[in-house]
């Protein structure tokens, strides 16, 4: 649960402006947008699968930290005023029987055709990146204006009912002398994935080539930097693929919803 803290009106305006820009057709990764405001992942599944997914998220809180649940027919979240989850992500992925069949920038027609969908909004590691930057730790994909690299790991999630799959991890290259600070900062924010799940040695996670992510873009890793891996909110999409859920809608990896909640509200 987030702390109810005072929000700078300028930050609220920036978050609303970002949502309106996205609603109007902005179609790029959202890292660095409305800096300091929480961003979230999303997965919508049929009502018949919703309990299984809720249990899956409960059993795997580091990769699937649920920040809000929207019942069928509800498209506004308590996390943001004037919001519509059908239009306020830059890009959506449409899934049938575990296969991605389409990507769209406006999902209203699809939600209208599937009125039984229950939506889960999941914490996102973009929400601790401002804190990293304020500590003097460069966030490479923001600096380079690329998408964060994400990988399907060999870490098995705890199954629930019909749902199972492996954890997806995001990666940020961190100078070796700053890793302890990065761990300390992110560990205080478990609702947005918390501390890293792995440091260095990507092959230990089943990653054959760190320069070829499964989602997003590759990041430069400079001399003296170590790849650091965090649990990622794309994990539900891996579960959709593995479990062959009949129908689902998700955000496209890196294309998030921007809320009215400041990042610092999640600091424990």
Curated annotation (Swiss-Prot):
<dbReference type="InterPro" id="IPR009906">
    <property type="entry name" value="D-Glu_cyclase"/>
</dbReference>
<dbReference type="InterPro" id="IPR038021">
    <property type="entry name" value="Putative_hydro-lyase"/>
</dbReference>
<keyword id="KW-0456">Lyase</keyword>
<dbReference type="Pfam" id="PF07286">
    <property type="entry name" value="D-Glu_cyclase"/>
</dbReference>
<dbReference type="InterPro" id="IPR016938">
    <property type="entry name" value="UPF0317"/>
</dbReference>
<dbReference type="GO" id="GO:0016829">
    <property type="term" value="F:lyase activity"/>
</dbReference>
<protein>
    <recommendedName>
        <fullName>Putative hydro-lyase A1S_1268</fullName>
        <ecNumber>4.2.1.-</ecNumber>
    </recommendedName>
</protein>
<comment type="similarity">
    <text>Belongs to the D-glutamate cyclase family.</text>
</comment>
